[in-house]
């Protein structure tokens, strides 16, 4: 899927829903002709490499669109750590403008990884060759590299017209106000009426509690998203 849970993910930091290594680093297992049994490779690959890989292995001859993000993995399969993945961008970029959680964006270049919080705009720099747990932030020691990587990250996101977190939050708020909240409150009112008629019904009482929590959560999400949208507008900053 996309990373382990927040517990038991050592030595990786964080887990699902995060762009720290605990949320994006996953093992990949491959077997087939030309692949040495029991071999191990440290070359980073990503899911969007598989399209070109499968096309190549299936014998595709016609050129694929030039603007594809990924690259073929045949060279890595056959040569291991000596193999290379040819992509349009040398860096790996992960962009997660999450409307209900921690909005963040990451660029990895070689052994270095820059993570940017899209709300606070704070950035962290890690050397993954020495610090896979992302415990030591090097941004203060290497400010030029931070600026360089952030410019590359931003330029790439602009080139693919990536969504901003403000846009995803606006769409989310409109979706909630467009029917989700009303439907949730109507269901809650119906369940409360049924429980009032049968106050000893434990299952119905449980359903009321779950429904109430869901309605309260959506109300909090609208409040949070609206507040953060206003913050970005007042600050006049890009949020990608």
Predicted regions and their residues:
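A generic structural signal for short coil/turn motifs at secondary-structure boundaries
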Residues: 37-40, 135-137
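Tryptophan-centered motif/residue detector
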Residues: 31-32, 94-96, 221-224
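Long, internal low-complexity/basic segments
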Residues: 50, 109, 120-122, 128-240
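The feature captures the short pre-catalytic strand/loop hairpin that immediately precedes
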Residues: 28-37
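Flexible nucleotide-interacting loop at or near the entrance of a catalytic core
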Residues: 12
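C-terminal cap/loop subdomain of S1 sulfatases and analogous C-terminal strand-loop tails that border
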Residues: 3-8, 16-19, 36-37, 43, ...
């Amino acid at each position: 899927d996309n990373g382990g849970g927040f517990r038991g993910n050592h030595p990786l930091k964080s887990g699902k829903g995060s762009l720290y290594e605990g949320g994006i680093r996953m093992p990949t297992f491959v077997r087939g002709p030309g692949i040495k049994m029991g071999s191990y490779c440290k070359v980073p690959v990503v899911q969007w490499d598989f399209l070109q890989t499968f096309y190549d292995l299936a014998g595709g001859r016609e050129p694929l669109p030039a603007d594809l993000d990924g690259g073929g993995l045949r060279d890595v399969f056959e040569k291991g750590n000596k193999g290379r993945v040819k992509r349009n961008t040398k860096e790996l970029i992960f962009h997660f403008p999450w409307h209900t959680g921690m909005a963040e964006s990451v660029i990895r270049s070689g052994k270095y990884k820059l993570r940017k919080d899209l709300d606070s705009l704070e950035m962290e720099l890690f050397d993954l060759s020495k610090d896979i747990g992302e415990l030591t932030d090097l941004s203060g020691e290497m400010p030029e590299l931070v600026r360089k990587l952030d410019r590359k990250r931003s330029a790439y996101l602009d080139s693919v017209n990536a969504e901003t977190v403000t846009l995803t939050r606006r769409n989310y708020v409109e979706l909630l106000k467009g029917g989700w909240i009303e439907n949730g409150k109507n269901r809650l009112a119906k369940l409360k009426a049924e429980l009032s008629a049968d106050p000893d019904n434990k299952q119905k009482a449980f359903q009321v509690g779950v429904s109430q929590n869901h309605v309260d959560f959506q109300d909090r999400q609208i409040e949070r998203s609206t507040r953060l949208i206003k913050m970005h507008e007042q600050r006049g900053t890009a949020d990608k």
